Amino acid sequence: MTSQRTRERLIQRLCEEGISNQRVLDVIRKTPRHLFVDEALAHRAYEDTALPIGHNQTISQPYMVARMSELLLAAGPLDKVMEIGTGSGYQTAVLAQLVERVFSVERIKGLQDRAKERLVELNLRNVVFRWGDGWEGWPALAPYNGIIVTAVATDVPQALLDQLAPGGRLVIPVGSGEVQQLMLIIREENGFSRHVLGAVRFVPLLNGPIA
């Protein structure tokens, strides 16, 4: 279930799917995904698939975690990254091992509390959490070198663009229902460059915190 061989099979699949950043692969290899899902689903933790985590939310497919992390890091090391949608905390844990500091925003208090516990268990101390509306980001601590959004937005939130540092990278799924596209947005000297990277499937980015 959680054997090294099972994890290696996942890494092999990610490589076959085009993930090439060795740091990202190493971090996913050593991060215990089974700790981020319900015990009843632990036997499926190293399958390359999204799994339910309650509250109508999911833990992202490992390929998508790797892909989004790789896109974020493509221009070099990052000091300060904001994550919109803590969820189970799995993507958070991966980011915490790849960048200096992670600022993670989650609207569902129950999910955030459990994610905090998991990161403490893994001794990942470079993450700060905010319970709030992901559409608003975390303006008090802006700007960020990177922003990653783990739910699909109907449009790119202006607040997130405003909080992106010069040269910063925003990785976000945009669309609705069956039509969703992963986008990479880079803050350039004279505005933003936008790159559409292909079809994806995420749960929606909703407004407002809930207990």
Swiss-Prot record:
GO molecular function annotations of the record: protein-L-isoaspartate (D-aspartate) O-methyltransferase activity
This protein's UniProt keywords: Cytoplasm, Methyltransferase, S-adenosyl-L-methionine, Transferase
Cellular compartment(s): Cytoplasm
Annotated active site: S60
Transmembrane feature ranges: none
Membership in a protein family: Belongs to the methyltransferase superfamily. L-isoaspartyl/D-aspartyl protein methyltransferase family.
Record-given protein name: Protein-L-isoaspartate O-methyltransferase
Source organism per UniProt: Pseudomonas syringae pv. syringae (strain B728a)
